[in-house]
Regions:
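N-terminal beta1-alpha1 cap of cysteine-dependent amidohydrolase-like domains
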Residues: 2-236, 243-318
Length: 318
């Protein structure tokens, strides 16, 4: 009899926990943003691209985000503060892409600072808003945080490398849920694509109190000096990669610096998935379906640029 009571009691506990966990799961599912939209910041065109428009976004960044289940809004330059306010309230995160404009004086940098400041303020009031920086975007994050250009020359242009993981990477937001297989691939195989002449050295990071207190170093690499290749903020959903995960599946320039192995494609997928899942935590939304539709990058057609640039396709804007 006592045993029967124990069994019934055990089943009661199991049913209780199952019901509680089921309701918790459904709560999470109900509150997850299933239609995330991420902004990509445009930047000034170089002389090669100027005939197509005054600013551009490489299409590989768009595909990177779309591949993990989000849509894209181009964040164009030279817009009013009111327009940037409206865009910020409408999108669920922003990506600062790679490129070659000036960190201090470009319109790209000016607009990035607007969104960076808004993101800090929003996250401080528990309004989740992630930022992702790739290559120049990664460098720009260090500039916006420190107020200084602390980059050093590394000439790391056209290289693939494995990443040197730090102890801090093990409990990082970015890599914590990565399958062990992918983690080991990044650490042992040359699947990270580097196209940068400048980098933030670990020495300059260590000497700068603002950077030390704001960013956790997740990976480093060495070329001439040791530099930071992946980082994330301690308190904010802000992430930077000096390398180019979007190039692996979407850029086909004949270059030794772009890996196309199945392993490298897996790496890209898991990083894109991480970023989009961060955006799913944001509840920002457009004021109407029409406003949303009018803002999406679907309103623009990519141009094939693979015969004369490092990008296969790019979007251009006036």
């Amino acid at each position: 009899m006592a045993r029967g009571l124990q069994v019934r009691g055990l089943w009661g506990l199991l049913i209780f926990f199952f019901c509680c966990s089921s309701s918790a799961v459904s709560f999470v599912l109900r509150n997850e943003n299933e239609r995330p939209i991420i902004g990509i910041l445009a930047q000034e065109t170089s002389k090669t691209f100027r005939k197509f428009g005054s600013s551009y976004i490489a299409a590989s960044y768009v595909k990177f985000i779309e591949s993990a289940g989000a849509r894209v809004v181009p964040v164009r330059l030279n817009r009013s503060n009111e327009e940037y306010d409206e865009i910020f309230r409408s999108i669920n995160g922003i990506l600062f892409p790679g490129g070659s404009v000036n960190l201090a004086t470009s319109e790209f940098s000016r607009v990035a600072k607007i969104f960076y400041t808004k993101a800090l303020e929003a996250n401080d009031r528990e309004d989740y808003f992630p930022i992702w920086g790739t290559c120049l975007g990664h460098q720009l994050l260090t500039y916006l945080t420190s107020g200084e250009n602390l980059l050093v020359r590394t000439n790391t242009n056209g290289f693939t490398m494995p990443l040197n993981f730090t102890e801090a990477s093990k409990d990082s937001k970015m890599f914590h849920d990565f399958p062990e297989e992918i983690y080991e691939l990044l650490a042992s195989e040359p699947v990270s694509s580097h196209f940068h002449f400048w980098s933030l050295s670990t020495q300059n990071y260590s000497r700068n109190e603002k950077l030390r207190n704001f960013y956790k170093i997740l990976t480093t690499n060495f070329h001439m000096v040791e530099f930071i290749s992946t980082m994330e903020a301690y308190r904010y959903p802000i992430y930077g990669v000096q390398w180019h995960p979007e190039k692996n599946p979407f850029e086909w320039k004949n270059s030794t610096g772009i890996p196309h192995s199945s392993a490298s494609i897996k790496v890209t997928f898991f990083l894109a998935d991480f970023l989009v899942n961060e955006a799913r935590k944001s509840n920002h939304h457009f004021s109407s379906k029409k406003a949303e539709a009018d803002a999406l990058i679907y309103n623009f057609n990519p141009v094939y640029t693979g015969t004369f640039s490092s990008f296969d396709q790019a979007y251009f804007f006036d």
